[in-house]
Amino acid sequence: ATTKIKPMKSHQYAVGAFYSLKDIADFSVEGYYKTMDNLLEYKDGASFMGASTNWEDKVSMGRGIAYGIEFLAQRSFGNTTGWIGYTWAKSDRIFDRPGNIINNGKRFPAKYDRRHDVNITATHKFSDRIDVSASWVFSSGNAATFAFHEYAAIDSPNYRQPDYSDSNGFHYGGFYPETHSHVESRNNFRYSNYHRLDLGVNFHKMTKRGNQRTWNISVYNVYSRLNPFYVYVWDESTRDPETEQWKTTKTLRQATLFPIIPSVTYTIKF
């Protein structure tokens, strides 16, 4: 908090229930509702170039609402243990106060508003020396803001690119009005869903000195899902073979990290 920025605050209410169904599984369910105030978001059109204005002048304060319900089922039978978790959630932001308006004062989804989350985990112990594990996770994509439309400003000066021809005989030049991007609403785009499968096996053994050592062999993202790390706008240029005119269209491209990654780990306890 500063002299201009108030401390963030929140109130959360939750209620839950637990039930054990003998010889089948343990079940739990919990619902929550959370209100938040004095949240910070960058203003529409805020520029990050230069330091002519203080960061406090580039942000707005607003409120948020989040609510959801969580389910969990667990079971242990023999040497196998597993659980399944599912969460349905929603998180919105509202910036409608005078001087702090974002998105025309209309409600918009938070960046990490993920509607669905699923976690499935299982472990099996073959013996005191060997155990295996598997885990699968899924979540809906995060929200992001992109400008899908452009327009030419009426009052912007046109500039002319000199006429010229390249070595292939293509002609260039003409008037080009200044264009501006138009964002329909805040966080108007969703990343693709995130999911992956991880597998692992542990080999345990006691050393002659009585220390426990473990070899772990794991595979992260077994089926090499290309989950989005971030998405960016790319200008795609194509040429019409008949008119020999170039046309530029904006497309979205996805950058990914961490495809399938095998690993080996050695641990000794002493």
Language model: regions and residue ranges:
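Membrane-embedded beta-barrel scaffold of Gram-negative outer-membrane proteins
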Residues: 4-56, 65
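Residues that define the transmembrane beta-barrel architecture of outer-membrane proteins
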Residues: 9-13, 63-67, 114-118, 193-197, ...
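Residues on the lipid-exposed face of transmembrane beta-strands in outer-membrane beta-barrel proteins
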Residues: 15-19, 69-75, 84, 120-124, ...
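Extracytoplasmic loops and strand-loop junctions of Gram-negative outer membrane beta-barrel proteins
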Residues: 1-2, 11, 50-58, 67, ...
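Gram-negative outer-membrane beta-barrel transporters
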Residues: 32-35, 53-148
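Outer-membrane beta-barrel translocator domains and adjoining extracellular loop/strand segments
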Residues: 1, 40-48, 89, 94-103, ...
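Outer-membrane beta-barrel proteins
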Residues: 3-5, 17, 57-61, 70-72, ...
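C-terminal beta-signal and adjacent terminal beta-strands/loops
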Residues: 37, 129, 138-177, 192-196, ...
